[in-house]
Amino acid sequence: MQVRLARGDELDAARARLIAEWGEPVVMRDRNWPLAGCECLVVGDVSRDDEPGDVPGEFAGLLAFSREEAPIAEVVALNAFTPRRGVGTALLAALPTHVGRGFTQLRLGTTNDNLDALRFYQRRGWRLAALRPGAVDRARTTKSSIPLTGDYGLPIRDEIDLVLDL
């Protein structure tokens, strides 16, 4: 499975797909993260084994990240469109190489209802770093499309940061 940094038309297609999934901007840690300003890692269509010439826009997975807060790189969005095939794991594993030298930590946020994501990240070495009670409630003032209830019928209220030291 090949992970690559998106450029040109592929970057535009990756950002458009993420915006379709998450809306624009992503609201996290009491700030707006415009996906249009993020870099993106991509995995092509894994059913085709990432053959050269993958058509832009046919993604098995995408990871948007920001280097704005050096020495911490922020994962702004992660989507594996082909579940349980190692796509998310491959994207996260490739990220340290792509953020470059001088970065000491990767950080991401998820919501309190996203128990599957919490398990996924912790099994890959990420650790819990912060809890922001009411952060999602505050985010709804900027982005009203955030649902009130999420996975497993849990109310979505809080954000949880996870970090991975490099």
Task: Name each region found by the language model.
Residues 143-166:
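Acidic/histidine-enriched, glycine/proline-rich intrinsically disordered or flexible terminal extensions
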Residues 99-112:
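Conserved GNAT acetyl-CoA-binding A-motif
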Residues 36, 75, 100, 116, ...:
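Short secondary-structure boundary/hinge segments and terminal tails
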Residues 89, 112-151:
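Conserved active-site alpha-helix within GNAT-family acetyltransferase domains
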Residues 5-83, 89-93, 98, 165:
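Acetyl-CoA-dependent GNAT
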Residues 1-3:
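Extreme N-terminal starter segment of soluble prokaryotic enzymes
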